[in-house]
């Protein structure tokens, strides 16, 4: 959890707006995980996009093998950023690996690149070109 928090908060600049643990019947019913005790950290970006980091304290699991962009199911998240080139350089300096440097999309309206968060989630970073 700490590595993911550092990635999203410290490196991508998202703001923590909630940090709590929940083992109530509500969370167990909603998630469908009996006995769930979940540590949740909710973050938001400047544009209002919100993500939740979840760690099931009651059901520890190893980090799965990284999914590929072409695998079926939810495989990546996309976050809009203001200065992709600068962010790319900062993340490289922190040891984050990318598939390619920021690249203009085929439609020409955005620069994009992919990296992985500390748990292997594909993160697409997008800068809209004005």
PLM-predicted stretches and their roles:
Residues 1-48, 86, 93:
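Core segments of cupin and vicinal oxygen chelate
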Residues 54, 126-129:
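Anionic group-transfer/hydrolysis microenvironments
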Residues 24, 58, 106, 129-130:
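A short acidic/small-residue loop/turn micro-motif
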Residues 21, 81, 127:
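Residues that line or immediately flank small-molecule/substrate-binding pockets and catalytic motifs
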Residues 1-2, 45-49, 55-122:
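Vicinal oxygen chelate
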Residues 19, 53-54:
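Short, conserved beta-strand edge motifs with alternating hydrophobic and charged residues
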């Amino acid at each position: 959890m700490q590595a993911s928090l550092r990635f999203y908060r410290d490196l991508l600049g998202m703001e923590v707006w909630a940090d709590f643990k929940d083992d109530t019947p509500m969370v167990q019913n909603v998630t469908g995980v009996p006995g769930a005790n979940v540590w949740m950290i909710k973050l938001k970006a400047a544009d209002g996009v919100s993500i939740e980091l979840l760690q099931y304290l009651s059901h520890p699991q190893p980090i799965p093998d990284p999914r590929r962009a072409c695998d079926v199911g939810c495989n990546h998240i996309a976050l809009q950023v203001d200065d992709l080139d600068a962010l790319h350089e900062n993340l490289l300096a922190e040891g984050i690996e990318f598939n390619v440097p920021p690249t203009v999309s085929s439609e020409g309206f955005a620069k994009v690149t992919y990296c992985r968060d500390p748990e292997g989630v594909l993160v697409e970073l997008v800068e809209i070109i004005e």
